[in-house]
Amino acid sequence: MKKIVINGGKRISGTIPISGAKNSVVALIPATILANDVVTLEGVPDISDVASLVEIMEIMGAKIERNLEEGRLVIDTRSVVSRPLPYGKINSLRASYYFNGALLGRFGQATVGLPGGCDLGPRPTDLHDKAFKALGAKKIQEEEAEHLEVIGDSLVGTTIYMDVVSVGATINTMLAASRAKGLTIIENAAREPEIIDVATLINNMGAQVRGAGTDIIRITGVDEMHGAQHTVIPDRIEAGTYLALAAAMGDGVIIENVIYEHLESFIAKLEEMGVGLTIREDSIEVHKSENLKSVNITSVPYPGFATDLQQPITPLLLKAKGRGSIVDTIYQKRVNHVPELARMGANISVLDDRIIYDAPNELTGSCVQATDLRAGAALVTAGIIASGTTKISNIEFILRGYDHIIEKLTAVGVDIQLIEE
């Protein structure tokens, strides 16, 4: 079993480069199926979710050239066929549901195992099902999978109102509708940068998507799509994770390859705490920060504070002075990091799905386990802050979403290693 071991309490300095966005690339790779051609993706992070997606694509018949050291995937989908996808790989991957939209759009049918990923409480796919049904597909629920197929000759554009703002459902609807007949309008669409990124790729492939990044998206379906080249946007969640770490333990750290506009609400909270920042065109310098103030955080859909960043910022909050709270309105059960931080000495608890902390706390190294991707990131930061040695298990969650995390942290002075036990 692989574990991460951190000897904490050491200040850090230097530069941390940000990789391509995990939450984009997990949709971009399935989206290439729509092209029936060769698509090149640049800036692809070297994470286990990408490896799983590549393996699934190859099972479907895609020919893929991988150079993840340079962040490049060349995907030829001309030989792809719609076939039942392997339950094991699908079950480990939340974003597997994007295969539904892509396969339905190109082939008019899809059979995909039920998605897995991190256990953050209920994340129903009802919105996806409702959208596919509105476009003219029916669902047949099987034991460990769902089968979708078009009723009639093809999907047909329509107006779809999202009852809840959902990134996954917005992207999935966009993928399927891009090959439907006529106009599809998505109302109450999610507005995340990753949606714009996916729309940019499929537009470059010949789709006609307008309004991505607003709450109304219009998609005019096309009969066929072609190859393209696309560079993945920087990962705003990885950037936020390292910004919080730099604020907690940095003696001057530069986070490179950042789009500031994607992180405005997060950066506003750092500044409210008293973190010193210099914002440049594509980088952010975090100055040594002391006498931090506690803040209250509520995660909401973009452009508000991202749910994926409420866990990574928590160790920084534990260095501030005063009492504060964290409320996650997206995933109320996203609190599994709390008992692990308490094990390290944090004065933190959960009350009615609200996280309450009293700070500052002196953290001490301990044996802890990552229960999901962003909880794992929080524990890495906590281990760097803590005195003594921290040993983190279940690190496969962390490797799902953080590209070369050991190497990046080692380069700025963190005593961290990956071990086999």
UniProtKB/Swiss-Prot annotation:
Alphabetized UniProt keyword annotations: Cell cycle, Cell division, Cell shape, Cell wall biogenesis/degradation, Cytoplasm, Peptidoglycan synthesis, Pyruvate, Transferase
Active site positions: 118
Binding, phosphoenolpyruvate: 22-23
GO terms classed as biological process: cell division; cell wall organization; peptidoglycan biosynthetic process; regulation of cell shape; UDP-N-acetylgalactosamine biosynthetic process
InterPro entries: Enolpyruvate_Tfrase_dom, Enolpyruvate_Tfrase_sf, MurA_subfamily, RNA3'P_cycl/enolpyr_Trfase_a/b, UDP_GlcNAc_COvinyl_MurA
UniProt-annotated location(s): Cytoplasm
Entry EC number(s): 2.5.1.7
Task performed by this protein: Cell wall formation. Adds enolpyruvyl to UDP-N-acetylglucosamine.
Family in the record: Belongs to the EPSP synthase family. MurA subfamily.
Protein name, as recorded: UDP-N-acetylglucosamine 1-carboxyvinyltransferase 2
Species this protein is from: Lactococcus lactis subsp. lactis (strain IL1403)
